[in-house]
């Protein structure tokens, strides 16, 4: 054990104990909180179905940093490099377009076998897998509609894709012993003002009911639905709005996905967690960083990330909130993006676990808002970094920016050859 990390840890334990916080218990609790890393940061959401195809659906990956993964083997190798630099439990979140097959596979015909290599890889690394149907970057989504499409044949294609995706997801959970959270997001919407806002939503409602009709083992599979305010090319109307999906998740008792970038810039999902959790059994979070719009910048250790973590910890939502990341920055080293964003999410969770919440809650109940504010601010200066370094030490990962050297070495010897 590195001497200075050990010394700082011992002092930090004393400091936190003085305010009623057990730092050792915080580390144990942090090990109960896996963060689901998204595979699509590694290749700018290209996937393996048609890697040279255009990214559609109102989303954009900007930048052209060299070395992006070109196939599944490279993507898994890049993920391995990132995983080595992130302490604690992780999961991997896959989209349907990351299937592997020697021959073309229609999206409504995907099967668990097309993801067998991912399952074997995840099992070897003791990772859970999560899943998503890919309702974008496809000829049948080109006019901006999928599950709400007015053409019943096209709509049925996407229903079948989502049904097939659920079976893939359930196979993940069954094989790996941890439920796969499958999130449905669709890009459906209109660029300009529609006349009929209701009909597409009626179609979406019926389509979703058809998608989830087959009963799957909840120990293997969890359904989630995700709203969005707007996308590029769908600025005026989004079929799957927040109100639509909140109503759907509450009435069908699915999980609700809250994406940090899918609301108006003045809204934050940290404030929505405690409201939505009263009506739905589970929440899926897509922690991201919207800059003026749903830009999916790399997650920072900023106020909103900290507030999201605080809501999970303060309300003991360990088993009801699933933490996922969703960003894709093609302007920087993609492995570094994974490492920075995931470590920041875990740092935020640790800081929340080190908060003297019981004391702060009592001050609030007593109406002593002066002391509440004072202690909230003072606790920000407590030596949480020393606790983080101990956590990294125990998980055999770099405790500080030393991880960047490993990324640079990999970039020089692997990424630069692509």
Curated annotation (Swiss-Prot):
Pathway: Carbohydrate degradation; L-rhamnose degradation; glycerone phosphate from L-rhamnose: step 1/3. Keywords: Cytoplasm, Isomerase, Manganese, Metal-binding, Rhamnose metabolism. It is an enzyme of class 5 (isomerase). It is found in: Cytoplasm. Catalyzes the interconversion of L-rhamnose and L-rhamnulose. The gene is rhaA. It catalyses: L-rhamnopyranose = L-rhamnulose. Binds 1 Mn(2+) ion per subunit. Homotetramer. Its cofactor is Mn(2+). One of its GO terms (biological process) is rhamnose catabolic process. This is L-rhamnose isomerase. Its EC number is 5.3.1.14. GO terms for cellular component: cytoplasm. One of its GO terms (molecular function) is L-rhamnose isomerase activity. Mn(2+) binds at residues 262, 294, 296. It comes from Cronobacter sakazakii (strain ATCC BAA-894).
């Amino acid at each position: 054990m590195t001497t200075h990390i050990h010394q700082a840890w011992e002092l930090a334990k004393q400091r936190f104990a003085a305010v009623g916080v057990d730092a050792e218990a915080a580390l144990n609790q942090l090990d109960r909180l896996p963060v689901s890393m998204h595979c699509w940061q590694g290749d700018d959401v290209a996937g393996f179905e048609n890697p040279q195809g255009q990214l559609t659906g109102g989303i954009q990956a900007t930048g052209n940093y060299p070395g992006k993964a070109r196939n599944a083997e490279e993507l898994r190798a890049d993920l391995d490099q990132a995983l080595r630099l992130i302490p604690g439990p992780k999961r991997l979140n896959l989209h349907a377009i990351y299937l592997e097959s020697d021959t073309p596979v229609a999206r409504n015909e995907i099967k668990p076998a097309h993801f067998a290599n991912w399952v074997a890889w995840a099992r070897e690394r003791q990772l859970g897998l999560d899943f998503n149907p890919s309702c974008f970057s496809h000829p049948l989504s080109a006019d901006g509609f999928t599950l709400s499409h007015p053409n019943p044949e096209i709509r049925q294609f996407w229903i079948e894709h989502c049904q097939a995706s659920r079976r893939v997801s359930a196979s993940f959970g069954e094989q790996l012993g941890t439920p796969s959270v499958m999130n449905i997001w669709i890009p459906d919407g209109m660029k300009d003002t529609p006349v009929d806002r209701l009909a597409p939503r009626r179609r979406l409602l019926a389509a979703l009911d058809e998608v989830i009709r087959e009963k799957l083992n909840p120990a293997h599979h969890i359904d989630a639905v995700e709203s969005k305010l707007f996308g590029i090319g769908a600025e005026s109307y989004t079929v799957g709005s927040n109100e639509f999906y909140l109503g759907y998740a509450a009435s069908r008792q699915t999980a609700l996905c809250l994406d940090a970038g899918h609301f108006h810039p003045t809204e934050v999902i940290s404030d929505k967690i405690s409201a939505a959790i009263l009506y739905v059994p589970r929440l899926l979070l897509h922690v991201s960083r919207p800059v003026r719009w749903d830009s999916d910048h790399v997650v920072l250790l900023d106020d909103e990330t900290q507030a999201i973590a605080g809501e999970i910890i303060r309300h003991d939502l360990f088993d009801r909130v699933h933490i996922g990341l969703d960003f894709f920055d093609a302007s920087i080293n993609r492995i570094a993006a994974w490492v920075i964003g995931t470590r920041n999410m875990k740092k935020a969770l640790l800081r929340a676990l080190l908060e003297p919440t019981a004391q702060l809650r009592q001050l609030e109940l007593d109406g002593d808002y002066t002391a509440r504010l004072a202690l909230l601010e003072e606790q920000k200066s407590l030596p949480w970094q020393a606790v983080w370094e101990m956590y990294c030490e125990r998980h055999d990962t770099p405790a500080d920016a030393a991880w960047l050297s490993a990324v640079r070495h990999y970039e020089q010897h692997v990424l630069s050859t692509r």
